[in-house]
């Protein structure tokens, strides 16, 4: 195995709830590297204007200044740190150009599931609208942490149509190991057993939520076998750029 590919982390300062300093970002990357990750995407939140972390000019500037500092520091170890964003679905559902949010070196945009304030039809419908607009731009939506969306947790079968549309569902590794609570853990395993999951990522936010997908890899391997688990972690399901 060449190493893990982690498409979802908040390890570069951007003014969101992830790494606060370049030094913290470097140390988080060290944790990822020592745990076996070789390609790591730094994906700060890009929320709607009314939400916690809108992608303001100030936040973009902070991220663009911090990113090369972290990237260059970790490159010497052999860790490939890449740019990206975690996009709130209403941004691209409402027509914003998704090409500004692409995961570097891929044809993918990471779109997050919304929170508790929508019912299941509203949540899945909003994500589907965003995914269709990403697809119209010639890109592939990767749909982040459906298991942490309460309406989906109440009705896990609701996301099958998203997976059947060819849109990769991406679980948080910590959900599989119980670190996001019993409901997220139960839902994550249900989705995995239903065969609708394509990718597992860390969604790391700091030292309390580190970028270690090796722990989830061990748990999934114990459940379904290493050969079946590996494609969820090695980047095989990521739509890489030609």
Task: Label the predicted regions.
Residues 1-76:
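An N-terminally biased module of ancient metal coordination in phosphate/nucleic-acid-related enzymes
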Residues 214-242:
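Mid-to-C-terminal alpha-helical segments outside catalytic/metal-binding sites
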Residues 11-22, 112-121, 176:
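Active-site mouth loops of central-metabolism enzymes
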Residues 45, 196-212:
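Short acidic/histidine-rich active-site segments
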Residues 166-178:
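His/Asp/Glu-enriched short active-site or ligand-binding loop at hydrolase and phosphoryl-transfer sites
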Residues 5-9, 40-42, 81-85, 109-111, ...:
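Hydrophobic faces of well-ordered beta-strands that scaffold small-molecule active sites
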Residues 21-24, 124-129, 154-161, 182-190, ...:
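Charged helix-capping and loop-helix junction motifs
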Residues 51-168:
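Extended substrate/RNA-proximal surfaces in nucleic-acid metabolism proteins
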């Amino acid at each position: 195995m060449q190493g893990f590919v982690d498409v979802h982390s908040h390890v570069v300062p951007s003014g969101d709830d992830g790494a606060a300093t370049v030094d913290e970002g470097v140390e988080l990357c060290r944790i990822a590297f020592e745990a076996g990750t070789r390609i790591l995407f730094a994906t700060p939140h890009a929320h709607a204007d009314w939400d916690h972390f809108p992608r303001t000019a100030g936040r973009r500037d902070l991220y663009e200044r911090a990113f090369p500092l972290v990237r260059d520091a970790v490159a010497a170890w052999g860790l490939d740190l890449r740019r990206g964003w975690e996009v709130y679905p209403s941004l691209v559902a409402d027509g914003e150009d998704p090409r500004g949010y692409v995961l570097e070196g891929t044809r993918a945009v990471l779109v997050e599931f919304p929170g508790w304030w929508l019912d299941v039809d509203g949540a899945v419908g909003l994500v589907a609208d965003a995914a269709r607009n990403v697809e119209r731009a010639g890109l592939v939506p990767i749909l982040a942490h459906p298991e942490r969306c309460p309406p989906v947790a109440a009705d896990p079968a609701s996301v099958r149509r998203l997976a059947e549309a060819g849109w990769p569902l991406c679980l948080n590794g910590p959900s599989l190991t119980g670190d996001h609570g019993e409901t997220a853990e139960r839902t994550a395993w249900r989705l995995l057993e239903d065969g609708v999951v394509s990718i597992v990522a860390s969604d790391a936010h700091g030292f309390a939520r580190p970028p270690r997908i090796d722990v989830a890899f061990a748990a999934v391997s114990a459940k379904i076998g290493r050969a079946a688990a590996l494609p969820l972690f090695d980047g095989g399901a990521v739509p890489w750029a030609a």
